[in-house]
From Swiss-Prot:
Superkingdom to which the source organism belongs: Eukaryota
Record EC number: 2.-.-.-
Topology feature Lumenal, residues: 25-442, 504-508, 565, 613-618, 671-685, 745-786, 846-858, 916-931
Biological processes per GO annotation: GPI anchor biosynthetic process
UniProt disease link: Multiple congenital anomalies-hypotonia-seizures syndrome 1: An autosomal recessive disorder characterized by neonatal hypotonia, lack of psychomotor development, seizures, dysmorphic features, and variable congenital anomalies involving the cardiac, urinary, and gastrointestinal systems. Most affected individuals die before 3 years of age.
PANTHER family listed in its UniProt record: GPI ETHANOLAMINE PHOSPHATE TRANSFERASE 1, PHOSPHATIDYLINOSITOL GLYCAN, CLASS N
Entry function: Ethanolamine phosphate transferase that catalyzes an ethanolamine phosphate (EtNP) transfer from phosphatidylethanolamine (PE) to the 2-OH position of the first alpha-1,4-linked mannose of the alpha-D-Man-(1->6)-alpha-D-Man-(1->4)-alpha-D-GlcN-(1->6)-(1-radyl,2-acyl-sn-glycero-3-phospho)-2-acyl-inositol (also termed H3) intermediate to generate an alpha-D-Man-(1->6)-2-PEtn-alpha-D-Man-(1->4)-alpha-D-GlcN-(1->6)-(1-radyl,2-acyl-sn-glycero-3-phospho)-2-acyl-inositol and participates in the eighth step of the glycosylphosphatidylinositol-anchor biosynthesis.
Pathway, per record: Glycolipid biosynthesis; glycosylphosphatidylinositol-anchor biosynthesis
Name of the protein this chain belongs to: GPI ethanolamine phosphate transferase 1
Subcellular location: Endoplasmic reticulum membrane
Principal EC category: transferase
Protein family per UniProt: Belongs to the PIGG/PIGN/PIGO family. PIGN subfamily.
Amino acid sequence: MLLFFTLGLLIHFVFFASIFDIYFTSPLVHGMTPQFTPLPPPARRLVLFVADGLRADALYELDENGNSRAPFIRNIIMHEGSWGISHTRVPTESRPGHVALIAGFYEDVSAVAKGWKENPVEFDSLFNESKYTWSWGSPDILPMFAKGASGDHVYTYSYDAKREDFGAQDATKLDTWVFDNVKDFFHHARNNQSLFSKINEEKIVFFLHLLGIDTNGHAHRPSSRDYKHNIKKVDDGVKEIVSMFNHFYGNDGKTTFIFTSDHGMTDWGSHGAGHPSETLTPLVTWGAGIKYPQRVSAQQFDDAFLKEWRLENWKRLDVNQADIAPLMTSLIGVPFPLNSVGILPVDYLNNTDLFKAESMFTNAVQILEQFKVKMTQKKEVTLPFLFTPFKLLSDSKQFNILRKARSYIKHRKFDEVVSLCKELIHLALKGLSYYHTYDRFFLGVNVVIGFVGWISYASLLIIKSHSNLIKGVSKEVKKPSHLLPCSFVAIGILVAFFLLIQACPWTYYVYGLLPLPIWYAVLREFQVIQDLVVSVLTYPLSHFVGYLLAFTLGIEVLVLSFFYRYMLTAGLTAFAAWPFLTRLWTRAKMTSLSWTFFSLLLAVFPLMPVVGRKPDISLVMGAGLLVLLLSLCVVTSLMKRKDSFIKEELLVHLLQVLSTVLSMYVVYSTQSSLLRKQGLPLMNQIISWATLASSLVVPLLSSPVLFQRLFSILLSLMSTYLLLSTGYEALFPLVLSCLMFVWINIEQETLQQSGVCCKQKLTSIQFSYNTDITQFRQLYLDDIRRAFFLVFFLVTAFFGTGNIASINSFDLASVYCFLTVFSPFMMGALMMWKILIPFVLVMCAFEAVQLTTQLSSKSLFLIVLVISDIMALHFFFLVKDYGSWLDIGTSISHYVIVMSMTIFLVFLNGLAQLLTTKKLRLCGKPKSHFM
């Protein structure tokens, strides 16, 4: 069975990885010829301000007194330049946002997982094409463009990473550092002839990355005074820098200024997903080559922002974030970034119609070059009779459009040129997408075949080894035939040869060949399949259809709960009514009432706000007090039992109570310290990490008696969970655990009611007994319900207090007891552990259910695996790459979550077994347990 689980784990890793090969592969191509506009540019230099984490509404709206938070930028909009909204794409993170701005290229979603400093951009950018680029700002952003550039013409000046502290006194210092260093740089340049000559060259870029707004947004939220004050500080800094540039270059009118943001931020201070507050960023441009403000009487937009911002009379020009890169390159006359997919927003340009037409033509040729390279690459690795070209953009059509565009330019029909080039760009982008997804159907079919095969094999294994379903059916053993293995070997050779002649990547061999051994294992059990069919036919059709419908309904409720959290409430409400629909109510009234009460109490959580809630430390304190009260009741009741406690066990419980008290103190004092802007106290940080480290060790010191061990696990994990909580979610594990304790009791009642085995006294059961294989029984129909309950509780543990399908559901304030200095992977790991704590509590309860119902962990675990895999297959079909970016990201993340859950089940099952069965001792004395 160990071999089966090892192979199962490997297969699930392949299925998990498949989504990245099918949907997350980078569309990058190399080998294009650089393209640039053959006319003199309007600007010699460009200054790019990126206010990290700045929302469009936060910049453009007026405050409660009717004044702008950024009066200088507002004045630019009304009197000097052009403005609009830059629409970003998912993931709304700093690296992808800057790549889109500076390279005109949308990285795939997996870019979020890349280390920023150690992973320079692998493609061309504005900085790379410039003669020189000087950049100031965050050490997380600047190095990736400098290291990715060819040559050494990109210079970076960044502060120490420790400055990025969410608990710092004043995050605006990150921005004032940038402004001060830029001023010092230009002051120094006057006395340095070499530097002076460089900054007086043409085709140069100055990049100012301003992180203060993002840091204040994470720490205090965008509605805070700190966030809004930071916008004013940035506005003042931009005003000073613009004045300095104009003075330094003698007001030569050859400087272009671009002010924008990489992404926005949600009301609760996070970003990463596709909410409008994250995807709508400001864009303000002025200076050389930029149109002056255009007064209009009416504008057509689907939103009501213009009226809210009182900018309805100034023409708003919206762009996609990647469009800013070709705008900047055309302004200073450098080649368009080779991998750019941005479309030049000609409405921003203040130049001749000829310049606009030539720039648009260059833009079209540059994107068409990518299409040609992509098509050639795909054609070279596909058999001629299997290759299907992109019909909308044939070679002849490309030639005709380009020829017609040149003819229009010659005859000075510039509007027609712009329109024709936009049409060509849209076709080329469609073609790029077509060839990028060319193999998607082949890969998808193989993954689905493998999935169905695996589910079939796991189901057959359950029926064959762990049930009585085919007992009594004919056991005639047939001599194995060599035809089946030979057939599969032949098919495998054909598939491998087909992939080899097409020069496919090695991963294609994995996806293409994996279904073969799986289906071979299924068809080897043909006798079991026959016996199963015979056995099923003996059951009444109505019973079979009823069970099938109930199972399907249960799966659909689980799937729908990923989209609508209130489905969890509906499911838990149905669970609450379950005892009254059976004989449980008559046999165990108190247990049934407890089950109903805690089911309904837990059902409240999915109805509460997912995110956007303000921190409420009083609820965290309340949860801590409830834990202490419960602990006092349990310890008191156990101490009353004769010989139930020895000193060591009492010491462990007191240690856990002390840990809970310390956690409450740390949460309160950390919150107070951060509000006073005094940062995270070192002692609090030490206590937090010590609590986290001890939470998986202290339970091993407690008694292995079932309820004592489970309660010890709850106390230890709750101490850590309190440190990671900011509001009502601190109550969630407590309510969930209470329901788990009742679940263990009620399952014993159902087992006795069904007459499968006699009821054991729970106070006499020790977790160490679960290694006794002689006590295990065969599976019955009711065990499918138990497995379904587990999956439902696991999904509830995931979605009970938030929608983790979305990156922006994470609140960074959750980790402030552990660290406040920006560290994406450490913070991510802590938040992942916060998600897994309820998961661990459910798995430990499941261990107890298996033990009390005398079931093999393997048999019940197999049913859980089948249910999870059916859900995963469901979500695989729901994955899409069309519609809004929020829909695309959500559909992919749902599949990733279910697959992760299935893989984590194996590891968490092992962790739960370790926590429940392992016993450590403080001293060498022999242990005694109460009966």
